[in-house]
């Protein structure tokens, strides 16, 4: 019985977060709140786009993939970026169970389009997040 109750609590778990830009709700004027899939998508993007040493009290947070964009874009570089993303999400976003990470190089714009497909235990369908990694000077 306790196992069934625990399972139902896990299935009903709701994740909430504030959007990065802290925009107000157009009708109520309150801060918008992201929930469930949207909250986890934002968290995944935050982890991927954060470089090491950007967080003062947690210097190992992030994936540090933006530094790899200054390397020559070869299949080995794409593989390294994919593995860095997979490792950082495994360490810093335990709610996301990574199913697939695909990269597509865009040499003309010096960018890399990353598609991350993951699932969440409490949500029935998989979620996809697209992140465009660009070189910033």
Regions found by a protein language model. Give the residues of each.
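Immediate N-terminus of the mature polypeptide
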Residues: 1-82, 87, 99, 104-137
């Amino acid at each position: 019985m306790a196992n069934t109750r625990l399972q139902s609590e896990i299935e009903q778990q709701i994740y909430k977060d504030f959007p990065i830009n802290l925009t107000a709700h157009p009708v109520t004027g309150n801060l918008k709140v992201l929930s469930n899939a949207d909250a986890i998508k934002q968290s995944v993007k935050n982890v991927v786009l954060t470089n090491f040493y950007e967080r003062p009290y947690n210097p190992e947070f992030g994936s540090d993939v933006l530094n790899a964009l200054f390397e020559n874009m070869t299949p080995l570089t794409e593989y390294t970026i994919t593995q860095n993303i997979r490792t950082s999400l495994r360490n810093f976003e335990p709610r996301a169970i990574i199913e697939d990470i695909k990269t597509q190089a865009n040499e003309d714009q010096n960018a890399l389009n990353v598609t991350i497909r993951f699932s969440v235990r409490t949500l029935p369908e998989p979620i996809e997040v697209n992140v465009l990694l660009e070189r910033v000077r």
